[in-house]
């Protein structure tokens, strides 16, 4: 299997970006909802730091994925797709990427505006002044962007199932 995409399927690197992101998000989203229910404590702060580190990892995987996509064309879609399907797929992908970036950035800004430090590997980052109004606003953005991401992932999976079962095209095989 080639590292680069071909006309028939995605290359190994694109597949790894896709499936690693999927697996991490399947764990990260419920983890985030679990954190919401925890009382404030040292344990919660430790778990939030893990959550943030995972989120930053997804951010960078997505960034590298987009850079790779820019320099490496996607497989052809074939003649069975009409323009509306292609437009919907492109919009879904665009908003998937946008929601991932929005979730990460808003989560980090929420934490920093709460006056907390962001522990990233061996460094601590923070703002000199807290702003609880902005922290609440970024928290709301973080939550709603997660709901958007969940919806988009569900639509993405549904579209793949429909294509695989009803249209019997090879769209799923391209990414496996």
What is the predicted function of each stretch?
Residues 1-176:
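Membrane-embedded alpha-helical bundles that constitute the cytochrome b-like, heme-associated redox core
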């Amino acid at each position: 299997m080639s590292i680069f995409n071909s006309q028939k399927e995605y290359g190994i690197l694109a597949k790894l970006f896709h499936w690693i992101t999927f697996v991490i998000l399947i764990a990260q989203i419920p983890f985030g909802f679990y954190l919401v229910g925890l009382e404030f404590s040292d344990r919660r702060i430790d778990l939030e730091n893990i959550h943030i580190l995972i989120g930053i990892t997804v951010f960078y995987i997505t960034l590298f994925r987009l850079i790779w996509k820019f320099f490496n064309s996607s497989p052809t879609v074939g003649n069975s797709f009409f323009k509306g399907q292609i437009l919907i797929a492109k919009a879904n992908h665009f908003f998937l990427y946008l929601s991932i970036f929005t979730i990460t950035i808003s989560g980090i800004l929420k934490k920093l505006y709460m006056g907390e430090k962001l522990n990233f590997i061996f460094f601590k980052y923070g703002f000199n002044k807290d702003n609880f109004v902005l922290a609440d606003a970024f928290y709301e953005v973080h939550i709603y962007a997660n709901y958007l991401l969940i919806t988009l992932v569900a639509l993405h999976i549904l579209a793949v199932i429909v294509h695989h079962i009803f249209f019997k095209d090879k769209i799923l095989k391209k990414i496996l």
